């Protein structure tokens, strides 16, 4: 049976790795865009990461250009933009598709595990998936849900 730890992803620098690198950690996996109305959420995400990273919490950002063309650059450009404008230090990855024919398998797995209000498909940037220390996808948060609003859910898993 497939688990979240079986998936291979690629960092914004082009390095591939398996998510088993985060076995035992709480993960928040987010599709991001640097020209979106929700882009200011990077500040809140970074605050959560800084507050809880030493307790086994990680945020994984995946730039996506499928919603309004709001991530026009490369994954590396997106990561640089996030670091420069929002101080992002959590792991950022290559630009990916979160739906459709070229959907990253990880996001197929996440959407199957937590269907969300709109059934399976991700409808916009900054959809967030919370994964517990055992690798279970326990919650899906809509883009409108600000990072501060999900902090209690993260704390419960730490």
UniProtKB/Swiss-Prot annotation:
PROSITE patterns: GLUTATHIONE_PEROXID_2 (PS00763), GLUTATHIONE_PEROXID_3 (PS51355). Keywords: Oxidoreductase, Peroxidase. GO terms for biological process: cellular response to oxidative stress. One of its GO terms (molecular function) is peroxidase activity. Pfam families: GSHPx. The keyword Oxidoreductase applies. SUPFAM superfamilies: Thioredoxin-like (SSF52833). The active site is at residue 36. The keyword Ribosomal protein does not apply. Belongs to the glutathione peroxidase family. This is Glutathione peroxidase homolog BsaA. It comes from Staphylococcus aureus (strain Mu50 / ATCC 700699).
């Amino acid at each position: 049976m497939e688990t979240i730890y079986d998936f291979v992803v690629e960092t914004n620098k082009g390095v591939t790795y398996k998510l088993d690198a985060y076995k035992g950690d709480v993960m928040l996996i987010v599709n991001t865009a640097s020209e979106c109305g929700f882009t200011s959420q990077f500040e809140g995400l970074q605050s959560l990461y800084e507050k809880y990273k030493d307790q086994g919490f990680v945020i994984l950002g995946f730039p996506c250009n499928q919603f309004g063309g709001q991530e026009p650059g490369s994954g590396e450009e997106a990561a640089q933009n996030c670091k420069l404008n929002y101080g992002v230090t959590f792991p950022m990855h290559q630009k990916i598709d979160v739906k459709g024919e070229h959907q990253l398998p990880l996001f197929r797995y996440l959407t199957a595990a937590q269907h969300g209000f709109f059934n399976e498909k991700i409808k916009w940037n900054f959809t967030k998936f919370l994964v517990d220390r055992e690798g279970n996808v326990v919650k899906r948060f809509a883009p409108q849900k600000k990072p501060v609003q999900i902090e209690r859910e993260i704390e419960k898993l730490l």
